[in-house]
Amino acid sequence: MMDLFKTDIMPDLQSSMMASIGSNWRFALFVAATLLTSYIVIVRPLKNVLFHPLRKYPGPKLFAGSSIPYGFWYMTGKWHTKIRQLHATYGPVVRIGPDELSYACPEAWEDIYGRYVPAKRKENPKPVWYCSPDAHDMVGASLGDHGRMRRVMTPGFTYSAMCKQEPLIKVHVDLFLEKLRGVCDDGNATVNMLEWFTYCTFDLIGDLSFGEPFGCLENSMLHPWLQLVFANIYVTHIILLCKRIPFFYLFLPIKTTLQLYRDFNRHVILLRQVVERRLSLTTPRNDFLDIMTSKKTSTLYLTNEEIFKNAILLTGGGAETTSSSLTGMAFILTTRPDVKKRIVEELHATFPNEEAINMRSVAQLTYTGAFIEEAMRYYPPGPNTMWRTTPAGGNTILGDYIPENTIIGIPHRVLYRSEAYWKHADEIHPERWLPDGQRPAEFDHDRREGFQPFSYGPRACIAMNLAYAEMRYILARFLWNFDIQETEQSKHWMDNQKAYLVWDKPGLFVRLKPVAKEEAQ
């Protein structure tokens, strides 16, 4: 009987026990998964809506409960349209995430982006998922490192420095105009001005930042590194979204992303070689690298890694925003012949010949300058928010205490198109930017101080003055040499564009007719 018990009954009992244990584990896992899912899907969103410190701020409950709705809108590239709808519905301050507030009012610039004031206001840092303080560039640098880098680099963006850089800049603008004459076929061919403005600005800024141009104008094509950047605008911004909201890693194309990292790393090696080649030169070039490497002291210096990273930053940030703005201006000029006519008249009333047009003299072009401001208001190069987070201990924004780790920011396009602050906000009126006495009275109450396309405060774009001078100079010489006309292909160019940190733009196809020499005198 004992033998029978061992051979027959024990295996059955053991099998039964193992089945029971397996069943219990499966049940336990099921319960745990159910509880976790319930917490994520139901409990946490309800907690965010009903008990979160930001619950008093207006906004859709769906967005207050979870960051997922925002993330999906951002993925579509249409967040700039959605956030405008939300502000139109809920007002100037909207809760767009469990821990995020969007401000669309001019008064918020100082509180969100203003400088650190001891015993009064702390600086709101950039989120680490947006700009890492370990990136060795000015964008994400700590308060102390940012101040050191900016003091080193500021002399490269003064009026005096710009005058010294002008001969180098002129070389690229001359080549830009020469190439356009070759491709326009006397107005019979369509020309993609997005491409040509991009070639020009990247060659120009690349030469100032790296010591040599990318060869875009010479070769009539983008450098492979720039091709990589522009071909992957969507993926790079989804990677940024994933760093913020890990849920969206589910939507990241893994194969494309891995290839992107490999390609970027390969180009980084090549760019480092370019910088090393430039730093080995002993002849002064009056470029950004001259400034970055001059007058080193124990407190005023840039490391080699900071030199390299800031060169990339100046190239990408400076060239893309300028080319985007110039392309937007070109489109507007094709749709507003009255504005184009007035700019051309101002050019010929101001300058006796093209040789008189330079980066200093274009400052006197009042209406042209007003047009540039209006074009950037209507079509800002960075349409969405440049994020900040409240520091440890929180901060005061517009008189209200905002708890720490709250994401805050101002969506540029929303603020610049708000009828609350701009007369005829969805129309183009360069005259709103004319000086007092020349400006029509209907625009006197526009909130022009709310227009900050290069950001605000101590971390505003260091190259802002150079960018304005560049745009005036390129636009003036472009319109001195060419008449620009729209094509059916790009008649609705601004409609339905996608936007992330920058616009994801289609080509702008226009017709260019060279202006006869006798007409341009």
UniProtKB/Swiss-Prot annotation:
InterPro entries: Cyt_P450 (IPR001128), Cyt_P450_CS (IPR017972), Cyt_P450_E_grp-I (IPR002401), Cyt_P450_sf (IPR036396), Cytochrome_P450_monoxygenase (IPR050121). Glycans are attached at residue 188. PROSITE patterns: CYTOCHROME_P450 (PS00086). Pathway: Mycotoxin biosynthesis. GO terms for molecular function: heme binding; iron ion binding; monooxygenase activity; oxidoreductase activity, acting on paired donors, with incorporation or reduction of molecular oxygen. It is found in: Membrane. It catalyses: dehydroprobetaenone I + NADPH + O2 + H(+) = epoxybetaenone + NADP(+) + H2O; dehydroprobetaenone I + 3 NADPH + 3 O2 + 3 H(+) = betaenone C + 3 NADP(+) + 3 H2O. Heme binds at residue 461. It comes from the Eukaryota. Cytochrome P450 monooxygenase; part of the gene cluster that mediates the biosynthesis of betaenones, phytotoxic polyketides involved in leaf spot disease in sugar beets. The first step of the pathway is the synthesis of dehydroprobetaenone I by the polyketide synthase bet1 and the enoyl reductase bet3 via condensation of one acetyl-CoA starter unit with 7 malonyl-CoA units and 5 methylations. The C-terminal reductase (R) domain of bet1 catalyzes the reductive release of the polyketide chain. Belongs to the cytochrome P450 family. This is Cytochrome P450 monooxygenase bet2. It comes from Neocamarosporium betae (Beet black rot fungus).
